A protein has these predicted regions:
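N-terminal auxiliary interaction/assembly segments of multi-subunit proteins
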Residues: 1-140
Length: 140
């Protein structure tokens, strides 16, 4: 499932924000705004997906989508929730079109503004422009 989410995140970088990126199997180094949503496969497996963006990246995403050069904290949080929904929603579509298990998702929730250190089964960092996006998945 994590590979499907990473594919969706790469698609987000390439097609939504149109920025070059690289992926590493590491934790983000910067302090990030973090959101999560829960995923349940049709087999009954449950996971929590985390998406986090540092302030540089989420502001850049906000500027791309909203045209705001300097967004307030509430707008950045809303943009993070929308980014999380776009990425995990895209992963759901990818799963439907491939051999991966289908799943349902909940509404994204704001988690925290801190280091990306929550317990998880897998972590990846996507380096985009001068920013970082963290992706993590945890079985529930």
């Amino acid at each position: 499932m994590l590979s499907t989410i990473l594919q969706a995140a790469e698609n987000f970088c390439a097609h939504q924000i149109r920025l070059p990126h690289t992926i590493e199997s590491t934790l983000p180094k910067k302090r990030t705004l973090i959101a999560y949503l829960d995923i349940e496969t049709h087999d009954g497996d449950k996971h929590r997906a985390y998406v986090g963006c540092d302030s540089v990246l989420i502001q850049h995403i906000s500027e791309i989508f909203l045209g705001e050069e300097e967004s307030d904290e509430e707008t950045l949080t809303d943009m993070l929730l929308e980014t999380t929904n776009m990425i995990i929603g895209s992963a759901k579509v990818i799963a439907l079109e491939s051999a991966h298990p289908e799943f349902t998702i909940t509404t994204p929730h704001f988690f925290q503004h801190d280091q990306f250190t929550m317990p998880a089964d897998g972590y990846h960092t996507i380096y985009i422009a001068d920013g970082e996006m963290g992706i993590a998945l945890k079985a529930l």
